[in-house]
Amino acid sequence: MDYSDDDMIDNESGEENNSDGGGNESYNYNAAVDTIILSEKSYVIIKEEEILKLQRDDIERVSTILFLSQVEAIVLLLHYHWCVSKLEDEWFTDEERIRKTVGILKEPVVDVNGTEVDIQCGICFESYTRKEIASVSCGHPYCKTCWTGYITTKIEDGPGCLRVKCPEPSCYAVVGQDMIDEVTEKKDKDKYYRYFLRSYVEDGKKMKWCPSPGCECAVEFGESSGYDVACLCSYRFCWNCSEDAHSPVDCETVSKWIFKNQDESENKNWILANSKPCPKCKRPIEKSHGCNHMTCSASCGHRFCWICGKSYSDHYACNNYVEDADHDKRTLLQSEIKRYTHYYVRWVENQSSRLKAMSDLEKFQSVQLKQLSDNQCKPKIDLQFIVDAWLQIIECRRVLKWTYAYGYYLDNLAKRPLFEYLQGEAETGLERLHHCAENELKQFFIKSEDPSDTFNAFRMKLTGLTKVTKTYFDNLVKALENGLADVTKSSEESADFLETQKLYDAYISEGCFF
């Protein structure tokens, strides 16, 4: 492939672009998610071809305004991390300083005589003709073979190849894309331009790539109080920390929770809480039977009492009380591990339920939707309420999952009753909705002669449950985002709030078609 100054950044545009990041089109539930969850987007999803255009526009602008070649404009933009305004301000303030800093020389420091027949390469020290020699703005001569080896090595080393300098150790002249195009092979050239494209997103502060494997979209983020974004590939993530979307829990809590789940010290705590060291060899021993007469395994073989730790050779009784700091420590650890397990198991289970719901939605859209449409003699658009229900389930499972991480780190005991009440009501509502969508829908996949009345009742029930569940979770999310502020009210106001909420819940339950 030939590369010119005009199409210098077009190398990726000819590649096949999977705009949905490898996702299944029938499983792209993002548009509906936006309707249900996001009242107003504060971000823009940008496809790869759009990034190329933005990149090209910036290069054209800098080249035109500063009266530079595109090669030089690219060097400057890379140095300034694609911040055009900062580049222009500093260039017009002190052009000479900027040229020296980035390595764009006006005049060569080495003047190779154009009439000279034999020119010595500065790397291999062999003599070459003028056509076999190449140099950048500094003029240091190197044969094209050495240039190829030098630049290829830089490309193999990673994105640093975008800022390669002249091979001469004391020279600061930059190697432009014209040299890359001239001396590298196609596979290395393609790798270089891949780094070049990604630099437009990764070097800036307002864009990030979607972290979903295989997705080639980026997200440009605006001003917002929340960081959750939904990519075109259906993946939802936090723009701030790049983890899975975790509102209403903040990034710091998520980071601590994930680290705790991966921390090997939790295994050590389990050992401390559920075992005792052999009094002789100090190896931890777990008691698996009722008898307190313990025998250490392996080469030790020491026999001792599990209760008091004394050797059985001189053991008579251990009913006398002796202060045992280790026992107190084990009790505390057992309590903490039990507490952690409570929250962790529910965090995992809700994630598992969410993934199952996503799979069920995919199956419904790809297989069951047409079948249900035929059986009930209804157009697919009239069955959108089922898709909406599954989307609500998926989102609610995500929120509920992270509320368990929130609950684990909730140290304010005064706030815990309100938190657990709101969480419990939301979870109960979600279970009703999930059960209805997962189990009660099955009967309608069997064709019946007069399906209308029964199916219409199901539609009303599922639609009602979807709305009610959304209300529960909206209340839960709002409360957590506000730091459970209702607890700061007087006890009388808090009691009134809970009583009002319970009356509302009772009213809703009566209307839930149960």
Swiss-Prot record:
Zn(2+) 6 binds at C305, C308, H315, C318. One of its GO terms (biological process) is protein ubiquitination. Zn(2+) 1 binds at C121, C124, C143, C146. Pathway: Protein modification; protein ubiquitination. The active site is at C291. It catalyses: [E2 ubiquitin-conjugating enzyme]-S-ubiquitinyl-L-cysteine + [acceptor protein]-L-lysine = [E2 ubiquitin-conjugating enzyme]-L-cysteine + [acceptor protein]-N(6)-ubiquitinyl-L-lysine. One of its GO terms (molecular function) is zinc ion binding. Residues 117-322 are annotated as: TRIAD supradomain. Keywords: Metal-binding, Repeat, Transferase, Ubl conjugation pathway, Zinc, Zinc-finger. It comes from the Eukaryota. Might act as an E3 ubiquitin-protein ligase, or as part of E3 complex, which accepts ubiquitin from specific E2 ubiquitin-conjugating enzymes and then transfers it to substrates. Members of the RBR family are atypical E3 ligases. They interact with the E2 conjugating enzyme UBE2L3 and function like HECT-type E3 enzymes: they bind E2s via the first RING-type zinc finger, but require an obligate trans-thiolation step during the ubiquitin transfer, requiring a conserved active site Cys residue in the second RING-type zinc finger. The active site probably forms a thioester intermediate with ubiquitin taken from the active-site cysteine of the E2 before ultimately transferring it to a Lys residue on the substrate. This is Probable E3 ubiquitin-protein ligase ARI10. It comes from Arabidopsis thaliana. The gene is ARI10.
